[in-house]
Design a protein with these regions (language model features):
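Conserved beta-strand-loop-alpha-helix hinge in the C-terminal portion
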Residues: 215-233
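ABC family nucleotide-binding domain
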Residues: 2-211
């Protein structure tokens, strides 16, 4: 069995008298330590997949296997523990606590899990050793996003889920953030899943899952993923 598997997953929403199918018979596998890009236009169903993998929503049909456990069968309490202990989230907007320093924001991870990584070391890993005591307002957008990545990574999660992590960043800063995520996969063995509409990012991934109209249309394995340093997008 693969590290992550979605099997015949459906997610439906009721809007008035209309049923919206957000995920239709979604199937794919992800191996441990891969950097994966889920690619598709707005409304393709990719963020719904991310919400299901992260335990933020429940599917209506199908199985979602993470490291040997079918989280689709989890109770509400089990899903809460799963989100807290096993998943790191990185979003387009940074969601940092404004009156806490960079180090204190990352230290929040130690209040959630018992085996949190050292905040100073994680911030050093993302290139912010010199910014430990700065507040979010004193940081650039790219630096704030790196703090949010450090906070997610400090939980030592099984999977790192990223929803358009470079969407609010300029080109050069976006490349810096993507390099951190690629290094997390290659050097730290993290399983990183990035949701994006930007198809030019596909070459950096080990696996690219193409979504369209709520379904997986294609899965491409990159035998030789491109280094982010050499990517132009």
């Amino acid at each position: 069995m693969a590290y992550i598997e979605m099997k015949h997953c459906y997610k439906r929403y009721q809007v008035g008298d209309t049923e919206i199918v957000a995920n239709r018979d979604v199937n794919f596998e992800i191996e441990k330590g891969e950097l994966v890009i889920i690619l598709g236009a707005s409304g393709a169903g990719k963020s719904t997949v991310l919400n299901l993998l992260g335990g933020m929503d429940t599917n209506d049909e199908g199985e979602i296997w993470i490291d040997g456990a079918n989280i689709a069968d989890y109770s509400s309490h089990q899903r809460t523990n799963y989100r807290r202990n096993d998943v790191g989230f990185v979003f387009q907007f940074y969601n940092l606590v404004s009156n806490l320093t960079a180090k204190e924001n990352v230290e929040l991870a130690s209040e959630i899990v018992t085996d949190a990584l050292n905040p100073e070391q994680v911030l050093t890993d993302v290139g912010l050793a010199h910014r430990l005591n700065n507040f979010p307002a004193q940081l650039s957008g790219g630096e704030q996003q790196r703090v949010s990545i450090a906070r997610a990574v400090a939980k030592n999660p099984k999977i790192l889920l990223c929803d358009e992590p470079t969407g609010a960043l300029d080109y050069q800063t976006g490349k810096q953030v993507l390099k951190i995520l690629q290094d997390m996969s290659r050097q730290k063995g993290a399983t990183v899943i990035i949701v994006t509409h930007n198809s030019s990012l596909a070459p950096i991934a080990d696996r690219v899952i193409h979504m369209h109209d709520a379904s997986v249309k294609d899965v491409v394995i990159n035998q030789h993923p491109q280094d982010i340093d050499s990517l132009e997008y």
